[in-house]
């Protein structure tokens, strides 16, 4: 058996028990091959409902390699569409309009429906599969609670909160197209406007207003100040903070390596006393212990000491032999 086929086979065997569990939990979205830790760095293979998504980040795949992948996973499920996204350096931005249209499908995770589409105007899938453990946590803990989902992207966490019976769910994201997918996800699960809300806003303006912190912005000479949605101060029972590695706006800079407190402090202050803040850091080179130390110091300085902390680890379709997954998730009980 060729070495590459052997690696795919081993990955499938390693997932057998997990996939049995996920299928029983009404889940058909998961990672099939996590190349970084399964023998082929830069290659990922995911199932999104009826779609097989293949992505390469280091080098383009040959037709033979693509055919081998398709044949191997045809034994698991009959894909209605196979999508290959070449995200290696020379091809990551080369995508014509025809490619971007793609087909739309519905995938399921833990009984919740999500819009899935392999080719679209952005690069990332609509649903980040390694965050399943976080969405699972929200499904189990959001009932009868007020929930704020920051950097909500396509609102998976917020959808889970509403499905769990949260008494209030608010999703905040700067990108209108992300929230549009979130609204589709809400419709796919028959959620009403009373159950879930969407706010298009910069993180800093929304989080600071909820936290009761004055909003400041950088304004160049001759320019008018940027407008932003006006929100009432409010604290939430459960806040979910999942920021990108780096982003800059007129209201602040997100930098998970050098300045995590800039996003953490307003999130802490928007969480009520006795509430829960779930926060993440997806930068692989930031060690867990260093990040946790920063989180604890920030909480103390903000006057919101952490009474207890627990950690969520991505599930077994994202293996991490050294026990240090890039995605770090901390649940802070305040």
Predicted regions and their residues:
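Conserved SAM-binding motif I beta-strand of class I
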Residues: 168-173
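Non-catalytic accessory regions of SAM-dependent methyltransferases
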Residues: 1-49
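Conserved class I S-adenosyl-L-methionine
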Residues: 144-153
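Mobile active-site "lid"/loop adjacent to the S-adenosyl-L-methionine
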Residues: 178, 221-266
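Conserved SAM-binding loop of SAM-dependent methyltransferases across substrates and taxa
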Residues: 154-167
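Non-catalytic substrate-recognition/targeting regions of SAM-dependent transferases
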Residues: 38-39, 43-46, 62-129, 136
């Amino acid at each position: 058996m060729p070495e590459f086929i052997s690696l795919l086979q081993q990955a499938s065997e390693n997932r057998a028990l997990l996939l049995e569990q996920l299928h029983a939990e009404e889940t058909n979205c998961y990672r099939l091959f996590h190349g970084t830790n399964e023998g082929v760095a830069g290659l990922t293979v995911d199932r999104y409902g009826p779609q097989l998504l293949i992505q390469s980040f280091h080098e383009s795949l040959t037709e033979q390699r693509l055919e081998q992948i398709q044949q191997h996973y045809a034994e698991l499920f009959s894909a209605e569409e196979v999508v290959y996204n070449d995200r290696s350096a020379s091809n990551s931005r080369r995508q014509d309009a025809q490619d971007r249209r793609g087909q739309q499908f519905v995938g399921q995770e833990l009984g919740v429906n999500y819009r899935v589409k392999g080719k679209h105007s952005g690069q990332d899938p609509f649903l980040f599969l390694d965050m399943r453990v976080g969405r699972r946590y929200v499904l189990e803990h959001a009932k009868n609670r007020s929930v704020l989902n920051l950097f909500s992207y396509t609102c998976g966490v917020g959808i889970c909160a509403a499905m769990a019976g949260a008494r209030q769910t608010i999703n905040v994201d700067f990108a209108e197209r992300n929230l549009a997918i979130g609204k589709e996800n809400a419709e796919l699960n028959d959620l009403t406007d009373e159950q879930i809300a969407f706010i298009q806003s910069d993180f800093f303006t929304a989080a600071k207003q909820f936290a009761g912190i004055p909003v400041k912005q950088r304004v160049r000479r001759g320019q008018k100040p940027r407008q932003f949605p006006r929100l009432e101060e409010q604290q939430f029972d459960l806040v979910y903070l999942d920021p990108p590695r780096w982003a800059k706006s007129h209201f602040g800079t997100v930098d998970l390596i050098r300045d995590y407190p800039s996003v953490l402090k307003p999130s802490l202050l928007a969480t009520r006393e006795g509430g829960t803040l779930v926060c993440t850091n997806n930068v692989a080179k930031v060690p867990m212990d260093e990040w946790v130390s920063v989180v604890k110091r920030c909480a103390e300085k903000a006057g919101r000491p952490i009474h207890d902390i627990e950690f969520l680890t991505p599930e077994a379709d994202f293996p991490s032999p050294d026990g240090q997954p890039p995605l770090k998730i901390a649940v802070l009980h305040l």
